């Protein structure tokens, strides 16, 4: 490892906030000055492609590909990501080594005149680029007009101000990290509007075998978050989760026990299947995998054939 630890990140305000939070935690844990770090901004395909849904453009990997290439090439030492944007299959030679303590995993509704989804007028436009959020909105309010909303948090809020839509759904964790929690007009309950696997958690990716970096990260890794994410990502992986599939999953850890709730839903919101499992937190990945097999058996293969 070089004297300066290079932190790779996307250039959006939220991505930079996450990179700087990681830097601050490392500085505090190891008594290091700011000069010991360099935040390296890397433009990704996901940032550049704004005219169509991610599912049509290539999926979640669009937000990580260029950053992971820089990590493999040694241009950066660690990569900081929103965990919900991470594909379940990482490139050879890379691993998710650490997670920061998870923020609030709930989604937030941001409305102008209407303060909740229930308050929206029939036929009102709600913006979202997430298939999961689109499907859940349609399940709650099939009379609404769900429109595609791409861009970072600030771009989406600007579109609301411009009247492109009457409301949108954003991750509450992202709003909090940007100091924008006040724009949330309603918080969506986890049981009604379950989050994406990994939502609210910052993940740190490294080269496999980079012992010096791994040793540094041990001090800031949050074990319960890592266990919850192992479960959620195993659930996603077993269902072939990508941006093409509306999948929700959320695990919580309490005194060494893990509780997981997962959901698969059709894009139009009319069909859904849920699963709930509990078990020892050390069996997190197994629980996630078992939950995926359970919900797949409940739904039947034809359910997936119809929309994946």
UniProtKB/Swiss-Prot annotation:
Species classification: Bacteria, Pseudomonadati, Pseudomonadota, Alphaproteobacteria, Hyphomicrobiales
Gene3D superfamilies with a match to the protein in the record: Periplasmic binding protein-like II, Porphobilinogen deaminase, C-terminal domain
Quaternary assembly: Monomer.
Any one Gene Ontology cellular component term annotated for this protein: cytoplasm
Enzyme class, broadest EC rank: transferase
Protein task: Tetrapolymerization of the monopyrrole PBG into the hydroxymethylbilane pre-uroporphyrinogen in several discrete steps.
Record's keyword annotation contains Ligase: no
An example Gene Ontology biological process: protoporphyrinogen IX biosynthetic process
Other notes: The porphobilinogen subunits are added to the dipyrromethane group.
Family stated for the protein in its record: Belongs to the HMBS family.
Modification type S-(dipyrrolylmethanemethyl)cysteine: residues: 243
Species: Mesorhizobium japonicum (strain LMG 29417 / CECT 9101 / MAFF 303099) (Mesorhizobium loti (strain MAFF 303099))
The entry's keywords: Porphyrin biosynthesis, Transferase
One family name in Pfam for this protein: Porphobil_deam
Catalytic activity: 4 porphobilinogen + H2O = hydroxymethylbilane + 4 NH4(+)
Keyword Transit peptide: no
Details of cofactor binding: Binds 1 dipyrromethane group covalently.
Cofactors named for this entry: dipyrromethane
Pathway annotation: Porphyrin-containing compound metabolism; protoporphyrin-IX biosynthesis; coproporphyrinogen-III from 5-aminolevulinate: step 2/4
UniProt gene name: hemC
HAMAP family: Porphobil_deam (MF_00260)
This protein's name: Porphobilinogen deaminase
Molecular functions per Gene Ontology: hydroxymethylbilane synthase activity
EC number, as in UniProt: 2.5.1.61
């Amino acid at each position: 490892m070089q004297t300066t630890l290079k932190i790779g990140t996307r250039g959006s305000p939220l991505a930079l906030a996450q990179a700087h939070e990681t830097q601050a935690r490392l500085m505090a844990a190891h008594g290091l000055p700011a000069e010991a770090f360099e935040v390296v901004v890397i433009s990704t395909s996901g940032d550049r492609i704004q005219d169509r849904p991610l599912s049509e453009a290539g999926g979640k990997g669009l937000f990580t590909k260029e950053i992971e290439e820089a990590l493999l090439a040694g241009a950066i030492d660690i990569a900081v990501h929103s965990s919900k944007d991470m594909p379940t299959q990482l490139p050879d030679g890379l691993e998710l080594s650490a997670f920061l303590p998870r923020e609030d995993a709930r989604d937030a509704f941001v409305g102008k005149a209407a303060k909740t989804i229930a308050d929206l007028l029939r036929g009102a436009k709600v913006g979202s680029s997430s298939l999961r959020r689109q499907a859940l909105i349609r399940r709650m309010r099939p009379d609404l007009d769900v429109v595609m909303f791409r861009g970072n948090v600030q771009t989406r809020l600007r579109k609301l101000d411009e009247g492109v839509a009457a409301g949108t759904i954003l991750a509450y964790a992202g709003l909090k990290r940007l100091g924008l929690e006040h724009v949330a007009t309603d918080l969506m309950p986890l049981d009604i509007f379950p989050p994406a696997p990994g939502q609210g958690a910052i993940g740190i990716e490294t080269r496999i075998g980079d012992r010096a970096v791994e040793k540094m990260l041990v001090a800031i890794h949050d074990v319960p978050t890592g266990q919850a994410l192992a479960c959620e990502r195993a659930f996603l992986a077993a269902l072939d989760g990508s941006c093409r599939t509306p999948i929700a999953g959320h695990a919580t850890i309490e005194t060494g026990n893990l509780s997981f709730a997962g959901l698969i839903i059709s894009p139009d919101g009319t069909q859904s299947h849920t699963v709930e499992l509990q078990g020892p937190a050390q069996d997190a990945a197994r629980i996630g995998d078992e939950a995926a097999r359970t919900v797949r058996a409940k739904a039947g293969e034809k359910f997936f054939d119809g929309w994946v």
